[in-house]
Amino acid sequence: MSSSFGKIFRVSTFGESHGGAVGVILDGCPPKLKVDINMIQNELDRRRPGQSDITTPRNEEDKIEILSGIKEGLTLGTPIAMLVRNKDQRPRDYDNLDQVFRPSHADGTYHLKYGIQASSGGGRASARETIGRVAAGAVAKQLLKNFCNTEILSWVKRIHDIDSDINKEKISLNKIDSNIVRCPDEKISAEMIERIKQLKRQGDSCGGVIECLVKNVPSGLGMPVFDKLEADLAKALMSLPATKGFEIGSGFSGTYLKGSEHNDAFIKSDDIRKLRTISNNSGGIQGGISNGENIEMKIAFKPTATIGKEQKTVNAEGKEVLMRAKGRHDPCVLPRAVPMVDAMVALVLVDHLLLNQAQCGLIDN
C-alpha cells in the first residue's frame, strides 16, 4: 500500500479517518527555510470539516502539531513530522456496514485486494488522509513563494451543472475565500451553494470541477519522456479522493482546433531565458518542461459516494442487500478540495524545482 510521494521532496502520510491521528513525514526539505506555522494552520482550516453548512458536520479542530524538523520558525533539513489528532471520530456509525460494500467506495476493492474493509469512514481511502498532504503542501507553497515568487490559486469552477467563467487576471485568494463554496463569482457562488443545500436535503450529492492557476512558474521544471511535469501533476491530482478527470491547457477542447489555431507562437523577449507566447494552449508546459508561462489545469471530482438515499448493493457473502448511509459526509467535496489541489500542485513543483537544481544547477545556460 503506497503512502509516499515525491523523489527529493518526499512526503509520507499516515493515519486513518477514525484512528487516533493523521499526519505526515516530510523528508528532503532544505534547511534554513522560514516556515510560518500559522500559514500551515490556515491551510488546514480551509480543508477542515464542519466549516459551513455545505460540508460534513464532523467537527474537528485539526490543530497542527510540529513534532520535528522545524525550530524557531526555520527548517533544520531533517525530516519534518506533523500530526493532527482525531477528536470527533464515530466508528460506530459504520457498524451496520462491516459486511456491506458501499456503492462507489473503496470497500469492495480493498476487500478484493487486501482482504480488509475500509468501511469505518473509509480508512486510508478517506479524504481525512489529505490532512498530511495539505500540511506538507503548505510548507512547499512557502518554499515556492520565497524562492520563486510562485503563487498557486485554485477555485471551484463548476458545481453540478452550474458553471462559472472567471477572469484569471483578477483572481486572488481573498476572492476565492470570500464565500463558503470557494467560487470567486458572487452571483454564481450563491447558486452553487443553494444547489448543494438542495441536494443535501434530498439525501443526495454532486460533483464538479476545480480550476487551478499557477503564476510565476520557473522555466525548466520537468523532464522528457517519463517524468514530464504535466504527467507528475496529473498523477498527484488524480491521487486525491474522488478525482475522475484532469486537463491541462486547452485540454479536451483543444481537440476541436487545428494546429494553426492551437500552436502557441513565441514572441520577442529581452531575456531569452524567459520565453513568452501569444497564447497558452499548452498550459505552461511544452515537451514535459515548464516554459515560464502560467500553468493552467482543471480537475474533475465525482459526486460524493456516501449519500442518504437507500441503495442496492451486496455484502461480503455476495448476497443482495439494501443499505442507507449513516455516517457524516460532505454533500459536495469541492469546497474543501480546493486546498488539497493547491497542496498537491505545490509538492510536485517543489520536487521538480529541487530535481532541476540537482541536475542543471551547475550548468551555465
From Swiss-Prot:
FMN binds at residues 124-126, 287, 302-306, 328. It is an enzyme of class 4 (lyase). Disulfide bonds: none annotated. Its cofactor is FMNH2. It comes from the Bacteria. Pathway: Metabolic intermediate biosynthesis; chorismate biosynthesis; chorismate from D-erythrose 4-phosphate and phosphoenolpyruvate: step 7/7. NADP(+) binds at residue 47. The keyword Lyase applies. Belongs to the chorismate synthase family. This reaction introduces a second double bond into the aromatic ring system. This is Chorismate synthase. It comes from Prochlorococcus marinus (strain MIT 9215). The gene is aroC.
